């Protein structure tokens, strides 16, 4: 088994009209901001414009659609993950961290990184548009996933799954991303 065996890729998980709707709504939203990383703003590591939508009242309908797609695909991922890794996606109560839309213009990027932070254990990405030249997600194994509207990727957010968002050459790239983390018991 190699690390690519735990990278789940499935097409057509969001309707293309919904993807276009999210892009157009994102472009008009005044709450967009310069994308940061776990330790803050670092333009040598990431250049994107971001918007966390899950706490926005006017994004509730879209948030629900993302949640339904994630719930369905997380269930498929749990069944799909081979031994001995399956216990890591079955044995811990989980929750998503919400949904963040990112816009990466030609020349923008997200350099090599992993998503291990706190209790995160899985990363998910939906591509909201097709990108024809570069703009792919690349893993340190050499696997490259080309953006297609509605395509979803789920993978462990741990350090062996180092990945990057390669700069699109001439098209603006839109994704929606987030993480599944171990559920935090608020009573503790």
Tell me what each language-model feature is.
Residues 1-92:
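Non-heme Fe(II)/2-oxoglutarate
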Residues 67, 72-188:
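Catalytic core of non-heme Fe(II) oxygenases with the double-stranded beta-helix
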């Amino acid at each position: 088994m190699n690390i690519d065996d735990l990278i789940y890729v499935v097409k057509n998980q969001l309707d293309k009209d919904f993807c276009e709707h999210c892009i157009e709504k994102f472009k008009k939203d005044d709450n967009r901001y310069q994308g940061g990383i776990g330790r803050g703003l670092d333009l040598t590591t990431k250049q994107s414009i971001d918007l966390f939508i899950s706490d926005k009242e006017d994004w509730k309908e879209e948030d629900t659609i993302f949640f339904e797609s994630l719930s369905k695909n997380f269930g498929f991922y749990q069944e799909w993950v081979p031994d001995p890794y399956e216990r890591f996606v079955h044995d811990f109560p989980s929750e998503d961290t919400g949904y963040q839309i990112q816009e990466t213009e030609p020349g923008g990027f997200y350099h090599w990184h992993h998503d291990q932070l706190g209790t995160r254990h899985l990363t998910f990405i939906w591509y909201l548009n097709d990108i024809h030249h570069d703009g792919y997600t690349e893993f340190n194994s050499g696997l490259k996933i080309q953006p297609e509207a509605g395509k979803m990727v789920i993978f462990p957010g741990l350090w062996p799954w180092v990945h990057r968002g390669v700069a699109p050459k001439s098209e603006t790239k839109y994704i929606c991303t987030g993480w599944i983390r171990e559920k935090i018991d608020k009573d503790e």
